[in-house]
């Protein structure tokens, strides 16, 4: 692991919003809009989460897998790299990187169980192993990911509001349905989640924020992005996006990339 975030490959790979909000040409040619591109990423992030619940891995593994997934599509198209295969492969790769290895055959078993009615999601072990090699290359073999969870706990402790831990942790989990981890340092995401939690739970920590000497404009902007996301998508925490919303988009993708 890198000594700290500021010297890590993760830090060096942070992107601007406009770099993330780009639809690859191959996907654009298939009629996929920027909003639809986002919908697929939300849908497949949820798919990773559901699959992870089946194989019982830690939240950190899920977060790393989703980060890989989102990072891949800043470089590759969904037409070329089928998200239905990339998603479980990212979970497989993340489980190894985070030292909670899940066997590929177990992922294949649960995918077939979860997606019994949709052949487009069903892949074999060799498909995952082959895609793993492609993903490693697409990620430039930079696999270290820093997450907001550790700074969140440290900052909540420092602010004296550890009673908000569960609530703020849930908000951090939800940020992985967005691209924030590709754009902002993890501690800034943590601060935004604390800011939201403190406002919604009527905890006045204004002085604490002032003592931190962070750019509150950035913290508030991230907070607004998160709140806007909640307001725009209204995702069912158990079911994800409605089928009638995501199916037409997924149908624009080739069956096998």
UniProtKB/Swiss-Prot annotation:
Top-rank taxon: Eukaryota
Gene Ontology, cellular component aspect: mediator complex; nucleus
GO MF annotation terms: cyclin-dependent protein serine/threonine kinase regulator activity
SUPFAM superfamilies registered for this protein in UniProt: Cyclin-like
GO BP: cell division; positive regulation of transcription by RNA polymerase II
Gene3D superfamilies to which the protein is assigned, alphabetical: Cyclin-like
Keyword field: Cell cycle, Cell division, Cyclin
Cross-referenced InterPro entries: Cyclin-like_dom, Cyclin-like_sf, Cyclin/Ssn8, Cyclin_N
Membrane in keyword set: no
Similarity comment: Belongs to the cyclin family. Cyclin C subfamily.
Protein name, as recorded: Cyclin-C1-1
Protein's organism: Oryza sativa subsp. japonica (Rice)
């Amino acid at each position: 692991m890198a000594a700290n975030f500021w010297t890590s490959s993760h830090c060096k790979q942070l992107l601007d919003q406009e770099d993330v909000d780009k639809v690859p040409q191959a996907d654009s040619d298939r009629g996929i809009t920027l909003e639809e591109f986002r919908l697929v990423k939300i849908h497949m992030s949820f798919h990773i989460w559901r699959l992870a619940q089946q194989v019982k891995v830690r939240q950190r593994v899920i977060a790393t897998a989703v980060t890989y997934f989102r990072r891949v599509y800043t470089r590759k198209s969904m037409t070329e790299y089928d998200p239905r295969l990339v998603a479980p492969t990212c979970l497989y790769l993340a489980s190894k990187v985070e030292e909670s290895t899940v066997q590929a055959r177990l992922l294949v078993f649960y995918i077939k169980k979860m997606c019994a009615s949709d052949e487009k999601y069903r892949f074999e072990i060799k498909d995952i192993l082959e895609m793993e090699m492609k993903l490693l290359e697409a990620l430039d073999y930079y696999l270290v990911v820093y997450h907001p969870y550790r700074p969140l706990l440290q900052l909540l402790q420092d602010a004296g509001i550890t009673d908000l831990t569960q609530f703020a942790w849930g908000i951090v989990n939800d940020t992985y349905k967005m691209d924030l981890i590709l754009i902002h340092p993890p501690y800034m995401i943590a601060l935004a989640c604390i800011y939201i939690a403190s406002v919604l739970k009527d905890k006045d920590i204004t002085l604490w924020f002032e003592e931190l000497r962070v750019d509150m404009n950035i913290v508030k902007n991230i907070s607004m992005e998160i709140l806007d996301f909640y307001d725009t998508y209204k995702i069912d925490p158990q079911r994800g996006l409605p089928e009638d919303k995501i199916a037409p988009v997924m149908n624009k993708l080739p069956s096998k990339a």
